[in-house]
A protein has these predicted regions:
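DNA-contacting interfaces and partner/effector-binding or oligomerization modules
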Residues: 1-24, 28-30, 38
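Nucleic acid-binding interface residues in structured DNA/RNA-binding domains
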Residues: 3-16, 62, 69-171
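A generic structural signal for ordered secondary structure
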Residues: 19, 24, 54, 126-127
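A sequence-level detector of short linear motifs
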Residues: 21-22, 31, 104, 153
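Compact structured core domains
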Residues: 24-76
Length: 171
């Protein structure tokens, strides 16, 4: 069955962090987030997602099952990153952070500055892009930390960031 560009599908996953909502456009994962009292559906910008079993959700469940067993998954589900070019680039860089490792906002900023051939990039700008990540856990924004190893904010809450880093034995 072909899906239109506006189709949005959702499926839920019970994780050690709480219930997660997986969102897809029918072929790629477009969102993964914790279901909150505000409801994950509110994050889908006014669309009415259909709950449906899709291959991308099956792949994502396999990835999450492996991850929550404390193993680095051997594959990444097909992702469709959203946001500005800068936000997408930050997400691409986060995808290269190995399981069990962390990097700082400043390290990502320095990498982007080198790529752009500019002297510096703001770590705060990187922080804004990290905070806009729509695909938690798989795009591992929890692996990005502050200068000096300081743990800083996480959209799903600091206690969950700590839980994920402990699972990966990063702290």
């Amino acid at each position: 069955m072909r899906h239109t560009a506006t189709d949005t599908f959702i499926q839920f996953y019970d994780s050690p962090l709480g219930k997660l909502a997986m969102r897809s456009d029918g072929s790629a994962l477009i969102g993964l987030g914790l279901v909150s009292k505000q409801a994950a559906v509110a994050a889908i910008a006014g669309s009415r997602p259909q709950e449906k079993s899709l291959l991308i959700f099956q792949e994502t469940v396999r990835w999450l099952d492996s991850y929550f067993r404390g193993r680095a998954p051997s594959f990444t589900p097909k992702l469709k990153l959203s946001g500005s070019d800068f936000q997408k680039r930050v997400c691409e860089i986060m995808l290269t952070i190995p399981f069990g490792k962390t990097v700082t906002y400043g390290e990502i900023a320095a990498r982007i500055a080198r790529e752009r051939g500019i002297p510096r990039m703001s770590a705060q700008a990187v922080g804004g892009a990290v905070g806009a990540n729509p695909i938690l856990i798989i795009v591992p924004c929890h692996r990005v930390i502050g200068a000096g190893g300081n743990l800083t904010g996480y959209g799903a809450g600091m206690e969950r960031k700590i839980q994920l880093l402990k699972l990966e034995k990063s702290i």
